[in-house]
C-alpha cells in the first residue's frame, strides 16, 4: 500500500543527493519515477534537482497554481513513485493533492525538504506534510560550529546572522548555515 513520506533536514544534510539516489535505484530496476521540484528554486535552473556534489536531474517544476493530482492522474503511465525536492515550498493544496495521489492512485510519494526556516518557523509545505505524512524521517547533519546535530538554519548577510525578513530567499552555502539550537541563539560569527 502506498504511503506519503516526508524526509526533512537542515541545509547541507544531503536531501537532494538522497532524492537522486532514490530515483536512480528505482530507474535502475526499470521502474520509472516522477521527479518534481518547486519552481521557486532557481539555483540550478527551474525544473532541476541538483546536489552540492554535482549530481543533477531534470524534474517537473511545480508552480503555485499547479494541480499536482491532475498532473499525475493525466500521465499515460503511472509512475512507480513520485519524488519531490524542495517540498517546503509546496502550498497546502499541493500537499493535500499529493495525499490524494497516495490514497486514490496508490502511488507512493516521497517529499524532501526543510522543516523550518531561518526564523525557526515552519514552512507552509512542511507544516502540512508533518500533518499528513504517513512516515516522517529526519535526514541528519552536523552543526557548522560544534558538530552536534544541526536542527536549525541561520541566514547570514555579509557574514552576520539575520533573524528577520522574508521567508523565501533562495540561497546556498553563502547564505544559510546549519546549526544546533545553542549556536542558533549564539552563533560564533
Curated annotation (Swiss-Prot):
GO terms for molecular function: ATP binding; thymidine kinase activity; zinc ion binding. The active site is at residue 86. It comes from the Bacteria. Zn(2+) binds at residues 143, 146, 180, 183. It catalyses: thymidine + ATP = dTMP + ADP + H(+). One of its GO terms (biological process) is DNA biosynthetic process. Its EC number is 2.7.1.21. It is found in: Cytoplasm. The keyword NAD does not apply. The keyword Phosphoprotein does not apply. ATP binds at residues 9-16, 85-88. GO terms for cellular component: cytosol. Belongs to the thymidine kinase family. NCBIfam families: PRK04296.1-4, PRK04296.1-5. Homotetramer. PANTHER family: THYMIDINE KINASE, THYMIDINE KINASE, CYTOSOLIC. This is Thymidine kinase. The gene is tdk.
